């Protein structure tokens, strides 16, 4: 049986919020079986819980933001990506601010945090969503789609006519039956254009944004002194984002996802379209260790 997983112990990290620029304390806690991933605004009284579910997604302008009434938690996608990549099914995530810290702009610090906490298997079967029929959402020349597939595969294409992008890969495809999320995906940082950051600052946003937590591009070049971590870092970050957004289904996927110039909004619309098309998917479980159709097949050692 492929079992559910949770962090082994409580662990904390601090960072700055991308938009507020304020210090954020994040606490990762173990959770019982079938809890799912639950965010908790512990700076509020009473504490407000927001499940990591596509149904709670509100704003998708610059990141994925979860809403529960007037309470929100923004920039959840990188942490969710790390949780998905390490196969964590159940966890409480306490934050004392309305956004998850941006860290270095990738999911790698969250992967390190989870690995440091350790991972424990739980006595319940892990649930998967298997894609049975193609589902597609498109708008203004952009699209996202699910396709049936025996494992988990993500293909993404960006399309920037820009000197920095023209000489680098703008399409990548990862089949996670043979790809390591930790080694090949989680280190890809978020990116943006200097002109956009200047506009955001004028709107009192991105106050925590810097060259320490994003790749910044001007009209001709990458401004970060150390450059890119690898040549396909731009488009690979879009895969990282998609893995986090798709984990808002509340289960790991068995199927293929394709994104073409898409972002958080289309990703969420695809999840909503999938869930109302009940003939296009099914829940499934695995009672054998011989087949691990998950985001990250190289599961880290766990303790029961």
Curated annotation (Swiss-Prot):
Zn(2+) binds at residues 78, 237, 241. The active site is at 264 (proton donor). Coiled coil: none annotated. GO terms for molecular function: metal ion binding; UDP-3-O-acyl-N-acetylglucosamine deacetylase activity. InterPro entries: Ribosomal_Su5_D2-typ_SF, UDP-acyl_GlcNac_deAcase, UDP-acyl_GlcNac_deAcase_C, UDP-acyl_N-AcGlcN_deAcase_N. Its cofactor is Zn(2+). It catalyses: a UDP-3-O-[(3R)-3-hydroxyacyl]-N-acetyl-alpha-D-glucosamine + H2O = a UDP-3-O-[(3R)-3-hydroxyacyl]-alpha-D-glucosamine + acetate. Belongs to the LpxC family. This is UDP-3-O-acyl-N-acetylglucosamine deacetylase. It comes from Legionella pneumophila subsp. pneumophila (strain Philadelphia 1 / ATCC 33152 / DSM 7513). The gene is lpxC.
């Amino acid at each position: 049986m492929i079992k559910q997983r949770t962090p082994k112990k409580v662990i904390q990290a601090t960072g700055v919020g991308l938009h507020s620029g304020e210090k954020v304390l994040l606490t990762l806690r173990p959770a019982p079986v079938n809890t799912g991933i639950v965010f908790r605004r512990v700076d509020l009284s009473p504490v407000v819980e927001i499940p990591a579910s596509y149904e709670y997604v509100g704003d998708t302008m610059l990141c994925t933001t979860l809403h529960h009434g007037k309470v929100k938690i923004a920039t959840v996608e990188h942490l969710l990506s790390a949780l998905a990549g390490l196969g964590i099914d159940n966890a409480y995530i306490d934050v004392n601010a309305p956004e998850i810290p941006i860290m270095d702009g990738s999911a790698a610090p969250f992967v390190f945090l989870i690995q440091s906490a350790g991972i424990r298997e739980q006595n319940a079967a892990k649930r998967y969503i298997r894609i049975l029929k193609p589902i597609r959402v498109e708008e203004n020349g952009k699209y996202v789609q699910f396709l049936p597939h025996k494992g988990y595969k993500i293909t993404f294409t960006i399309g920037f006519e820009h000197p920095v992008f023209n000489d680098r890969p703008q399409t990548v495809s990862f089949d996670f039956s043979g790809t390591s999320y930790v080694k090949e995906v989680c280190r890809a940082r978020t990116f943006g254009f200097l002109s956009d950051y200047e506009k955001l600052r004028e709107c009192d946003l991105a106050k925590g944004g810097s060259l320490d937590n994003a790749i910044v591009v001007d009209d001709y070049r990458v401004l970060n002194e150390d450059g890119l971590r690898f040549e396909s870092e731009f488009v690979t970050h879009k895969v990282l984002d998609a893995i986090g957004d798709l984990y808002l289904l509340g289960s790991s996927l068995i199927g293929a996802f394709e994104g073409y110039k898409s972002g958080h909004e289309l990703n969420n619309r695809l999840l909503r379209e999938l869930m109302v098309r009940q003939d296009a998917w099914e829940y499934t479980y695995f009672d054998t260790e011989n087949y691990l159709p998950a985001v990250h097949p190289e599961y880290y050692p766990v303790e029961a």
